[in-house]
Amino acid sequence: MEKPRGTEEAPSSEPMEEEEEDDLDLFGGYDSFRSYNSSAGSESSSYLEESSEAENEDREAGELPTSPLHLFSSANNRSLDGSGSEPAVCEMCGIVGTREAFFSKTKRFCSVSCSRSYSSNSKKASILARLQGKPPTKKAKVLHKAAWSAKIGAFLHAQGTGQLADGTPTGQDALVLGFDWGKFLKDHSYKAAPVSCFKHVPLYDQWEDVMKGMKVEVLNSDAVLPSRVYWIATVIQAAGYRVLLRYEGFENDASHDFWCNLGTVDVHPIGWCAINSKILVPPRTIHAKFTDWKSYLMKRLVGSRTLPADFHIKMVESMKYPFRQGMRLEVVDKTQVSRTRMAVVDTVIGGRLRLLYEDGDSDDDFWCHMWSPLIHPVGWSRRVGHGIKMSDRRCDMSHHPTFRKIYCDAVPYLFKKVRAVYTEGGWFEEGMKLEAIDPLNLGSICVATICKVLLDGYLMICVDGGPSTDGSDWFCYHASSHAIFPATFCQKNDIELTPPKGYETQPFAWETYLEKTKSKAAPARLFNMDCPNHGFKVGMKLEAVDLMEPRLICVATVKRVVHRLLSIHFDGWDNEYDQWVDCESPDIYPVGWCELTGYQLQPPVSAEPNTPQKGKDTTKKKKKQFGKKRKRIPSAKTRPLRQGSKKPLLEDNLEALGVSEPVPDDIIAVCVKEEHQDISSLDRSPSPQLPLPIESIKQERNN
């Protein structure tokens, strides 16, 4: 059988012996992760030890990709930020930090807890080795040192259940409340954006191996047997991480087709069952269709393609994220976007970080991706001249598990790098005019002014005609950002430009405005207008973060493509909630990403849900603007209310709208990402009006 390159041999870490239970053999080399959550269990500990050993041996042999964390250990002579600090990796938990912040003279551990755990487990391992008659070794083995692949693998398969502290369902709870992409795509003949369009997701650069017609071994759900059995299926259609499969033997009969996520445990390359002594059994519906199934399969498999043998291992490796719970960093202040605040990483899901503000309450959080331009290493604000909130008051967080586990500051290498800038020959100046995406209304591109030029290419920008006079609505963009544009960009690309508030001359003309304000436009040569061949097309479906409520990921559609700029429409919501994002934004994901990571996906809803609560609203029109998106996940607790797209700072009007127990508004700022120099053509086809089914709003379960 023909296979993609690099699939000739199975990884050496794959166990060959037969398991007692059929669900133990996951990822072609990683055992069951069911007991991952019970770290005190001896069975889990034994597995973690064995997995860590096998993983290390394979990595030394060059068979497994090196994780981001291991890259630091080989660069321990490099300075982190030019201050002479050296990176260090904790030998117990694998966290990355600076040597000066680590515990003990040897700087081998990030905390006294890790040091004691390592010492205790080393002694246990030594005693166990002697009892087994093994000679003592110089390098002690740590019994409870969990392999990264085990942890991420456990999360990848959503073995855990429950909710985060902010009420967001995860794991199986999220999948139960989830959304059926397969039915949605098939019923309306929608097309999903390919995984290869998203450079921040697992295996984006290898998804070309997944194609129509390829064969896989998949769990047979149409069998009445005491154990799990498998059968061969053909990929009929690929939609993001999800594929439409048809069991071999049904031929042209599509009545039993089913959707499956390729990142799940039950899909394997051809040959996996033979290697792992699993049984291939045809579905009960067609069991009597052929008498010689072996000959039939041989004919069907000749010349076909399958998944790489290490597909799931690479999937797990690509989901190793260097950020860990307890790392400190600087993040934009959601209540005042012109400054940053200190925060601590609380949760990492699929590269998305839930951050807790150090000077806030235990539920004062902020969600963003680890590649977001809104987060920075500690000291960034002071270095570039950006404002930061300094508070003498620090809330008592001793009871909070995240703040009890603060290890160290996140090192600069963990953050997305920005493009180097050269200011010779003219640079941005204060007072220059330009066009920019409004971070408080991401569906609008506005006339803006450079208010301050910071170091390292950063700019403080404000929207002309804004309500603030003290600079509290300024926001920071890097000069290479694709969220800022030269004057006349909107005019040239037929995009509606939002004029300054109070500007009466219609239509807006840049020449007239510059003359009236006695200002000049920023030179077009200073903007980064590179456009890669991103592959997005109008009408493609994806999963997108609602940046005004960034803990929500919703079903969305690419409404318009302008060079590398995408207009994202949230299915079921009004156009006023549309958002402009860059084609390489880390806040958009392929179909099936939420299912892959165990995150809850918000389904489309009707524009006017028929619910009893709606009948109680006296000002329905305004209520829709402020409270509509919040109804996607009613929180178990009183949550800060995120506004709609038009008026993000109207706290005084909340009582008039009938909102109970209002709290300070949460403002989510810029949606930008680092760029690469490529060339692509302009796609400006109009957006179709897509029919949307009426779906019920999914609600969180209270713990």
UniProtKB/Swiss-Prot annotation:
Q: Which tissue types show expression of this protein?
A: Ubiquitous.
User: Phosphoserine: which positions carry it?
Assistant: 13, 67, 338, 681, 685, 687
MBT-type repeats, residues = 179-283, 291-391, 397-500, 508-604
Q: Where is the composition biased (Polar residues)?
A: 73-82
Q: Which Gene3D superfamilies match?
A: 2.30.30.140, 3.30.60.160
Zinc-finger (FCS-type) residue ranges come to: 81-116
Q: Which InterPro entries match?
A: Mbt, MBT_L3MBTL2_rpt1, MBT_L3MBTL2_rpt2, PcG_chromatin_remod_factors, Znf_FCS, Znf_FCS_sf
Q: Where is this cross-link: Glycyl lysine isopeptide (Lys-Gly) (interchain with G-Cter in SUMO2)?
A: 405, 647, 673, 698
Q: Which residues bind Zn(2+)?
A: 90, 93, 110, 114
Q: Which UniProt keywords apply?
A: Chromatin regulator, Isopeptide bond, Metal-binding, Nucleus, Phosphoprotein, Repeat, Transcription, Transcription regulation, Ubl conjugation, Zinc, Zinc-finger
Question: Which terms under GO biological process does the entry name?
Answer: chromatin organization; ectoderm development; negative regulation of gene expression; regulation of DNA-templated transcription; stem cell differentiation; stem cell proliferation
Where is this protein primarily located? Answer: nucleus
Localization, UniProt: Nucleus
Q: Where do Basic residues bias regions lie?
A: 619-634
Give the source's domain of life in one word.
Eukaryota
- Posttranslational mods: Phosphorylated.
**Quaternary organization:** Part of the E2F6.com-1 complex in G0 phase composed of E2F6, MGA, MAX, TFDP1, CBX3, BAT8, EUHMTASE1, RING1, RNF2, MBLR, BAT8 and YAF2.
The record's function comment reads: Putative Polycomb group (PcG) protein. PcG proteins maintain the transcriptionally repressive state of genes, probably via a modification of chromatin, rendering it heritably changed in its expressibility. Its association with a chromatin-remodeling complex suggests that it may contribute to prevent expression of genes that trigger the cell into mitosis. Binds to monomethylated and dimethylated 'Lys-20' on histone H4. Binds histone H3 peptides that are monomethylated or dimethylated on 'Lys-4', 'Lys-9' or 'Lys-27'.
Q: What is this protein called?
A: Lethal(3)malignant brain tumor-like protein 2
